[in-house]
């Protein structure tokens, strides 16, 4: 039996003995539930620390929230580097064929935020990224339908590709988010963008070009149709 099963069994046996001696069942159940919750939280924290050790570098005072996901498809934790005193509740993902994510000190990554890299995403210090933000430095798929189909079939057969040769038509460019930037909820940051120091990205904006320092950026994409090249 595992450690958790042994502890649960121990709690049950102790409860039976206490009930036989006239101990109040309701009081014991409350105590047992509290202790089991502590055991569960302890095991969850242990699993989280094991995840950190194998998938990323976590600076002093930094934490991964219970909702955080580290999806490192590369071979080393050095490719996801989180600085000191930062808190991440979102998903950090590296593709197997490339990518790295570097997050500075005193940063916050909100719940359901997705940061996916196949090239490079660098986030400075004191950056606030709200919930439901998407940051992607690559196109993920080819604009050519046949290449997309082959890519999908290869993933099903062999898993995600490990070299750039296996993803024809895919394009990636580095993203840089400088110090003291605030990205509000629901924003999307696309490849090749640099956001200057202290700038604010308004909720729901889609950023496709550089933002100078100290600016408020607001952009809602309007419907626009053009032929596929």
Put a short name on every predicted segment.
Residues 184, 190, 202, 207-208:
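Short hydrophobic beta-strand segments in globular cytosolic domains
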Residues 218-219:
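Catalytic binding pocket for nucleotide-activated donors in carbohydrate/polymer assembly enzymes
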Residues 1-143, 150-155, 160-163, 167-180, ...:
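Domain-scale signature associated with acetyltransferase and cell-envelope carbohydrate enzymes
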Residues 194, 209-210:
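Conserved functional loop/turn residues at catalytic and ligand-binding sites
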